[in-house]
């Protein structure tokens, strides 16, 4: 089907009305020289399909972070990992923030998971505040998914709040998925 008007993803940088585009992970300073050189150096590898298990990357992350390879999951973008989380762990009822990245609800529902929402308030500039903790404590589900910073609000959850959320999720044996891509 053809559309008379485009339905683009991301900002319209070509209109010159946008200085910085936060709708996609685009470096506003351009591609670093080291990345350009890495692309040039690997052109001959383009005939090979990438390693689906990302063995070299997993090894490098494991060594750099000092964690076992079995604790590392790599994928082709955040959406693949979000869907993998939902399929692999199979939560029955998950809590997401509202507003938030729409892919969480899509992935959860695709895995036959019931989705509940905790609404962030305009009056508090969409910050996650203390009223969330008692709500989470009494939530009758088995998973919590959110991004930090929040998409689309850009609000960052404090370290203290993250630690309290983690404590509640551990005590309640809830899956916790924190997306920090941006």
Language model features with spans:
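Short loop-beta-helix segment that forms the pyridoxal 5′-phosphate
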Residues: 50, 62-84
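Short, structured coil segments at secondary-structure junctions
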Residues: 68, 111-112
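N-terminal "arm"/small-domain region of PLP-dependent enzymes with the aminotransferase-like
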Residues: 1-48, 140
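Glycine/small-residue-rich loop that forms an oxyanion/phosphate-binding "nest" at active or ligand-binding sites
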Residues: 77-86, 90, 178, 182
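Short acidic capping loops at alpha-helix termini that bridge into adjacent secondary structure
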Residues: 68-72, 93, 173, 180
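Conserved PLP-anchoring active-site segment centered on the Schiff-base-forming lysine
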Residues: 88-109, 134
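Active-site phosphate-binding strand-loop segment of PLP-dependent enzymes
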Residues: 116, 122-182
């Amino acid at each position: 089907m053809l559309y008379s008007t485009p339905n683009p993803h991301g900002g319209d940088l070509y209109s010159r009305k946008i200085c910085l585009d936060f709708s996609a992970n685009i470096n506003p300073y351009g591609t670093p020289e080291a990345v350009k050189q890495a692309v040039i150096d690997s052109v001959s590898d383009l005939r090979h399909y990438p390693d689906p298990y990302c063995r070299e990357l997993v090894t490098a992350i494991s060594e750099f972070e000092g964690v076992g390879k079995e604790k590392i999951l790599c994928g082709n973008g955040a959406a693949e990992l979000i869907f993998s989380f939902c399929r692999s762990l199979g939560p029955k009822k998950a809590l997401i923030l509202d507003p938030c990245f729409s892919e969480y609800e899509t992935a959860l529902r695709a895995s036959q998971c019931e989705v509940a929402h905790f609404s962030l308030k305009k009056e508090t500039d969409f910050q996650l505040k203390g009223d969330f903790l008692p709500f989470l404590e009494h939530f009758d589900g088995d998973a919590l998914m959110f991004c930090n910073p929040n998409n689309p609000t850009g609000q960052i959850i404090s370290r203290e709040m993250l630690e309290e959320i983690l404590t509640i999720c551990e005590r309640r044996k809830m899956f916790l998925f924190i997306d920090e891509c941006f």
